[in-house]
C-alpha cells in the first residue's frame, strides 16, 4: 500500500481525442493503430504538463492505464502500445510517467493499479471504470475534473 497519492489517467476520450479521429472505429477494426497516433490532445497540454510535473515533485505518482482496442491480437496490441507511448512522448514530453499500462480491452483498471483506498485517483471517461475504481475505495473523476484536482493538489489541499 502506498501513502503517496497515485494519479491514474486513461488516454482515449480522457486526454487523447481518439473518437474525433476520422474513421477511427473502421481503422481499429482493420488493425490499424493510426487513430491512436492521430488523436488530438483534449486540453491545454502545456498547462497540464506543468501541473503534472508540479504534482510529481510533491510526491504524486503518475500512471497511464489505457485499454487496447476491442479487436486485438498480440501483434496489434504491441502496435497500440507503441503508438500510445509515442503519443505521450510527443504531446507530453516533459512528463516522466511512473508507469504506463496498456491493457486488453475491458480489463478492470483498479485491479491493474492495485487500488487500496483513497490515495488512488482515476481520471477516466468510462463510467464502468470509475465505478470499479470506487468499489475499492479509490477516487474516480471525469476528465473535466483533471485541471481542478491537479490545482488543488498543487496548492496543498
Task: Identify the residue ranges that each predicted region occupies.
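Short glycine/proline-centered loop/turn elements that form peptide/ligand docking sites
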Residues: 24, 126-132, 140-152
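Hydrophobic anchor at the start of a short beta-strand
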Residues: 62, 120, 138-141
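Conserved Lys-Pro-Asp/Glu-containing loop-to-beta segment of HAD-superfamily phosphomonoesterases
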Residues: 101-128, 133
Amino acid at each position: 500500500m502506498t501513502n503517496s497519492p497515485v494519479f491514474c489517467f486513461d488516454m482515449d476520450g480522457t486526454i487523447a481525442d481518439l473518437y474525433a479521429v476520422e474513421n477511427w472505429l473502421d481503422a481499429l477494426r482493420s488493425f490499424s493503430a493510426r487513430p491512436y497516433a492521430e488523436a488530438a490532445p483534449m486540453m491545454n497540454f502545456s498547462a497540464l504538463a506543468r501541473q503534472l510535473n508540479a504534482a510529481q515533485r510533491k510526491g504524486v505518482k503518475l500512471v497511464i492505464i489505457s485499454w487496447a482496442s476491442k479487436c486485438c491480437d498480440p501483434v496489434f496490441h504491441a502496435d497500440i502500445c507503441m503508438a500510445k507511448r509515442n503519443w505521450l512522448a510527443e504531446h507530453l514530453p516533459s512528463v516522466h510517467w511512473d508507469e504506463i499500462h496498456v491493457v486488453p480491452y475491458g480489463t478492470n483498471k483498479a485491479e491493474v493499479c492495485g487500488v487500496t483506498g483513497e490515495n488512488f485517483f482515476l481520471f477516466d471517461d468510462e463510467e464502468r471504470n470509475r465505478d470499479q475504481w470506487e468499489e475499492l475505495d479509490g477516487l474516480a473523476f471525469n476528465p473535466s475534473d483533471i485541471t481542478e484536482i491537479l490545482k488543488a493538489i498543487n496548492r496543498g489541499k
